[in-house]
Amino acid sequence: MTELPDNTRWQLWIVAFGFFMQSLDTTIVNTALPSMAKSLGESPLHMHMVVVSYVLTVAVMLPASGWLADKIGVRNIFFAAIVLFTLGSLFCALSGTLNQLVLARVLQGVGGAMMVPVGRLTVMKIVPRTQYMAAMTFVTLPGQIGPLLGPALGGVLVEYASWHWIFLINIPVGIVGAMATFMLMPNYTIETRRFDLPGFLLLAIGMAVLTLALDGSKSMGISPWTLAGLAAGGAAAILLYLFHAKKNSGALFSLRLFRTPTFSLGLLGSFAGRIGSGMLPFMTPVFLQIGLGFSPFHAGLMMIPMVLGSMGMKRIVVQIVNRFGYRRVLVATTLGLALVSLLFMSVALLGWYYLLPLVLLLQGMVNSARFSSMNTLTLKDLPDTLASSGNSLLSMIMQLSMSIGVTIAGMLLGMFGQQHIGIDSSATHHVFMYTWLCMAVIIALPAIIFARVPNDTQQNMVISRRKRSL
């Protein structure tokens, strides 16, 4: 990094700020959801759509981001991503209804989907390969700080200003970032193959319609017959994509990926695993505020140990997998996360609040070990010709499963709560207790998939793939 010219350093700073904006926004909103519900006159049971709309949009748009950057240029797309993200933030702050807020979050998600993958591509183009790892470490560090600051910052802004400021703070940062991108970043383009628009549309329709069908009865009052039609339509779109990919060599994601057994198992396990774990960052601050009566600031502070545990575990997870193997680590962390989530609920309902930071620290550590192991398992055996496509598909599945997880969590709250939730009441405690029991079962189920994973303990497998991903 010391030998890089000044203009390259500035370009890395621009990418780093983009990573920070995107990662901050994934966690800062969760703490503010109860306050948003009160301000908008909505039930807290409907507020999960604020999270789902953003994460699902990111999942849908991810496959197109790399192609757009190659075709139109990394500067143009990164500039557009920051502008869209900033405009989305402004519209979020100006929203007067839940529907307006959800639409604004969709616009924000379009920008967020392009920001991180295009940022990675930019680093690859402006930095020599010998310094690529150091450069990626530099630009991704703010992305790790964002989730740490997000809950606490969101709590401070909600408690001492209003929820609108969690979006307004993005505007000055976005303006500076857009100007710096336009002036300092080179606009690299390369020859691209034809974009698989039919495949992209089939996947986008399938993901969006299936998620809507999962949640429509509670949030939108859609009739059961309409929901059944939506579910059938979404499933048909996914099946049509599989048929399309089988016949088309230039498909968005080649079916040759699934000839690698560890990729198939890892992708299926990642999808199922992140549905369960994706519920926790959404449900925890909601429960702390609505179930236990914590202030937004206090609830935000309580989330910090979980992020610290996650960051700390990344330093030793490679050695753990090398020692015990993928199967043992994945099964143990999956079951362990389910048990820790039940421990959190038990400690909270017993009133032992002083133990909550320790439990959340443990939850972050277990979750991080599982995430890192799942990612490595999924990609480690792919041939180089398919590695980029496999990584893109994994990124899309990660976002999709998180949106499904939040949707299911909201559905469970609605089912047990029946629209009647009050602050720190006995009935509310029962609602969250039943919801957490269901969540624990959902979190534990992927252990069945991971039990089929080969228990590979070769030392170079994890470490070499970890380096390659950076």
From Swiss-Prot:
Belongs to the major facilitator superfamily. TCR/Tet family. It is a multi-pass membrane protein. The chain crosses the membrane at residues 12-32, 49-69, 77-97, 102-124, 138-158, 165-185, 197-217, 225-245, 263-283, 286-306, 342-362, 396-416, 431-451. It comes from Salmonella dublin (strain CT_02021853). CDD domains: MFS_LmrB_MDR_like (cd17503). Residues 1-11, 70-76, 125-137, 186-196, 246-262, 307-341, 417-430 are periplasmic. Keywords: Cell inner membrane, Cell membrane, Membrane, Transmembrane, Transmembrane helix, Transport. GO terms for cellular component: plasma membrane. Residues 33-48, 98-101, 159-164, 218-224, 284-285, 363-395, 452-470 are cytoplasmic. InterPro entries: MFS, MFS_dom, MFS_trans_sf, Multi-R_MdtD. One of its GO terms (molecular function) is transmembrane transporter activity. The keyword Transport applies. SUPFAM superfamilies: MFS general substrate transporter (SSF103473). This is Putative multidrug resistance protein MdtD. It is found in: Cell inner membrane. Its main location: membrane. Disulfide bonds: none annotated.
